[in-house]
A protein has these predicted regions:
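Glycine-rich and small/hydrophobic secondary-structure elements
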Residues: 111-137
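Conserved active-site and cofactor/substrate-binding residues in soluble primary-metabolism enzymes
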Residues: 2, 6, 10, 41, ...
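Active-site- and interface-proximal helix/loop "cap" or "latch" segments in soluble metabolic
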Residues: 56, 60-118
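Short, glycine- and charge-enriched coil/turn segments that flank and shape catalytic ligand pockets
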Residues: 25, 49-54, 100-108, 141
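Structured beta-strand/loop patches that form or line metal/cofactor-binding pockets in enzymes
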Residues: 17-57, 62
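Short, conserved "active-site rim" segments that organize catalytic pockets and cofactor/ligand binding
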Residues: 3-25
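Conserved small/polar residues in nucleotide/adenosyl-binding loops
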Residues: 138-144
Length: 144
């Protein structure tokens, strides 16, 4: 019950008040992802510090269901300020969690994103939850 309440609070907060849903100028990388089964469309923009190999800023625009929008916002909150290789690692952990294959320790690494763990039991919503993370992982892999 406590996990479900936390899930609802995290999802609602990031959907209703997404901190990272806006446009940014002069992004180093821009990728779009679409989930045709739900109508989700996310355009992710990231800025990198190539010398430090870190993500210094990021934002997303687009439309979609509450899960896709909240999940993208949670991802950006988690990866901004992190080294690029760590962002890839976190994205891979999230995708592992959604497949119900992550350990408790790995889920703990995901901080608030761990609240979405039960999406693995909702097959129709999996594509919604992973869209932003797949785009983020692809963006970071282009910079490594």
């Amino acid at each position: 019950m406590e996990t479900k309440t936390f899930y609802n609070e995290v999802l609602t907060d990031h959907n209703m008040h997404p901190y990272h849903k806006h446009d940014i100028d002069n992004a180093d990388l821009e990728l779009e992802g679409v989930n045709p089964s739900c109508g989700d469309d996310i355009i992710l923009k990231l800025k990198f510090d190539d010398a430090k190999k870190t993500i210094v800023d990021g934002a997303f625009t687009g439309d979609g269901c509450a899960i896709s929008q909240a999940s993208a916002d949670i991802m950006l909150e988690l990866i901004i300020g992190k080294p690029i290789d760590e962002a890839v690692h976190l994205s891979e952990l999230f995708l592992k969690m959604i497949k119900d294959e992550a350990t408790e320790e790995e889920i703990d690494e995901l901080d608030e994103a761990g609240a979405l763990r039960d999406i693995s039991h909702m097959p129709a919503r999996v594509k919604c939850a992973v869209l932003g993370w797949q785009i983020g992982r692809a963006s970071c892999r282009e910079r490594v």
